[in-house]
């Protein structure tokens, strides 16, 4: 079966999911991102790699970190950046998604960065754009968030060196999390020997065992001797029905406190894709501790998105 993210030469042309993404492509992105990370105290480099290309940010769902870091990344690559105001666009007047894309393509769009509430929307767009136009998935429904997973992989590699002896615990609302799915695919592709998914039974999707992960409903069991702890927020906006008694009850059993973090390895790092809800999935004392690398994720996200845009466009320094 053909991989819609690659051309016939095996080169990246769209970034839609970490599922099925070859290890060599993931490592290419991480290695290229490393060349973009500025030295401490310096700014991100300004490079002409996307000079003359137009990058359209199409965010049909709200975003702060992802949209902003994509915009910064594109500008650092000298692209012309267009942020479409979805609420004021023709899509709010009934225009179809593909008609919107066709009209923007006629404006010489070179790259679409798409966040959409419908799983599969970026795939649909990628199937209908011209060969010289590229698509990056910035999050689609519950399905995938590949650049978040890639920046997570970069952060882990930066702090831990390699992946082949790590235990990684992903904790929280896995049922509704596109980040969890994308992280799992990336971690297993990169050879992490033990990936644990930790959540109450009501927030665990079916089929996790087939993804090669260990499922834990007990927080202490899931955290024990972990090298990396990735916390996920409760996605109340996607929940249907009473999946949890209360946020207070959730924190009581699944919130990451200093006492629970002590079950992990002493040098364990704590990550979070944001937005972070203190006192719900993570205690402030942990979020503000030296083990938390959450702001590193944001910084590295710019470099990783620079690398992703460069590779799909077929350019590099």
Curated annotation (Swiss-Prot):
Alphabetically ordered keywords of this record: Pyrimidine biosynthesis, Transferase
PANTHER family: ASPARTATE CARBAMOYLTRANSFERASE, ORNITHINE CARBAMOYLTRANSFERASE, MITOCHONDRIAL
EC code: 2.1.3.2
Chain residues that bind L-aspartate: 93, 178, 233
Catalyses which reaction(s): carbamoyl phosphate + L-aspartate = N-carbamoyl-L-aspartate + phosphate + H(+)
Complexes and interactors: Heterododecamer (2C3:3R2) of six catalytic PyrB chains organized as two trimers (C3), and six regulatory PyrI chains organized as three dimers (R2).
Biological processes annotated in GO: 'de novo' pyrimidine nucleobase biosynthetic process; 'de novo' UMP biosynthetic process; amino acid metabolic process
Highest taxon in the source lineage: Bacteria
Identification of the protein by name: Aspartate carbamoyltransferase catalytic subunit
Name of the encoding gene: pyrB
Entry GO MF terms: amino acid binding; aspartate carbamoyltransferase activity
Entry function: Catalyzes the condensation of carbamoyl phosphate and aspartate to form carbamoyl aspartate and inorganic phosphate, the committed step in the de novo pyrimidine nucleotide biosynthesis pathway.
Protein species of origin: Bordetella parapertussis (strain 12822 / ATCC BAA-587 / NCTC 13253)
Pathway in which the depicted protein is active: Pyrimidine metabolism; UMP biosynthesis via de novo pathway; (S)-dihydroorotate from bicarbonate: step 2/3
Family statement: Belongs to the aspartate/ornithine carbamoyltransferase superfamily. ATCase family.
Cellular component terms per the entry's GO annotation: cytosol
InterPro entries in alphabetical order: Asp/Orn_carbamoyltranf_P-bd, Asp/Orn_carbamoylTrfase, Asp/Orn_carbamoylTrfase_sf, Asp_carbamoyltransf, Asp_carbamoyltransf_Asp/Orn-bd
Broad class of enzyme this protein falls into: transferase
Residues that bind carbamoyl phosphate: 65-66, 115, 145, 148, 274-275
